């Protein structure tokens, strides 16, 4: 499952709507269907009507599934389109199936949320959409300009977060609160013996010769943790407050750095 989140969508254009495209698929065969919340659609020049007050789901022509939570302006069409070819800029045309979320004209602080399920099956997708209305396998724990974070509850408890600035993410379920010193990507996964922390710095820090340089990111976890035996990466720093653990990680080349942590029973590093 890929969870897609967007926030702080804004535009001053009052004439043209701002849209988030879910898919735009060429209809290479006549009657190639898409499925819209259980309805198989094959007609051309058709705009599908969807109930915005409920969870909707889509299956595109390549069996990619989409589940869209309620309260969003979803539009789905099958139509003939004309466009400019990207190679020679000549006029071109074709039949396409398209789906998008409409944020309206001149939007301010709009957002979106949907999930993508590759290699999906219509029957299974329909069951999932129905079940997710009451019991989704994940929940969004933060969605704002500072961070996007999702807690996966099935099959494993895992917190996945994209931090756009230094910020603190409150504890989610059995997982501790997380504070980061710089923008980064963080995964915290619960294991029987403790936690696995993964951190990625998307900033390559290229020098004048376009060579990636290392950078340090400090992650603070609530609780008294220590790096488990056999883990070579990371350095634990103890704050004055024993209720928190700082872990300094050196990241480079956009690659993840992974650290295994166990509860520090003795209270010393």
Regions found by a protein language model. Name each.
Residues 1-269:
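Terminal accessory/anchoring regions of large secretory-pathway or extracellular enzymes
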């Amino acid at each position: 499952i890929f969870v897609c989140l967007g926030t702080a969508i804004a535009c001053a254009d009052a004439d043209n709507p701002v849209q988030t495209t879910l898919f735009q698929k060429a209809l290479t065969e006549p009657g190639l269907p898409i499925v819209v919340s259980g309805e198989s659609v094959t007609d051309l020049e058709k705009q599908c009507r969807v109930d915005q007050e409920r969870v909707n789901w889509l299956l595109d022509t390549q069996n990619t599934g989409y589940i869209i939570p309620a309260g969003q302006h979803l539009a789905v069409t099958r139509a003939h389109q004309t466009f400019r070819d990207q190679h020679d800029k000549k006029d071109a045309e074709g039949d396409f199936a398209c789906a998008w979320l409409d944020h309206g004209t001149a939007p301010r602080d709009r957002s979106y949320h949907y999930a993508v399920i590759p290699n999906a099956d219509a029957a299974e997708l329909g069951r999932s959409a129905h079940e997710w209305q009451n019991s989704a396998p994940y929940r969004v724990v933060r969605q704002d300009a500072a961070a996007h974070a999702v807690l996966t509850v099935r099959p494993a408890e895992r917190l996945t977060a994209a931090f756009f600035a230094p910020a603190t993410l409150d504890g989610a379920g059995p997982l501790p609160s997380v504070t980061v010193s710089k923008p980064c990507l963080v995964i915290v996964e619960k294991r029987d013996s403790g936690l696995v922390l993964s951190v990625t710095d998307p900033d390559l820090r290229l020098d004048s010769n376009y060579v990636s340089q290392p950078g340090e990111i400090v992650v603070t976890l609530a609780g008294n943790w220590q790096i488990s035996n056999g883990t070579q990466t990371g350095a634990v720093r103890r704050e004055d407050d024993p209720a928190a653990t700082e872990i300094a990680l050196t990241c480079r080349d956009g690659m993840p750095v992974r650290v295994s942590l166990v509860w520090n029973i003795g209270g010393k590093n």
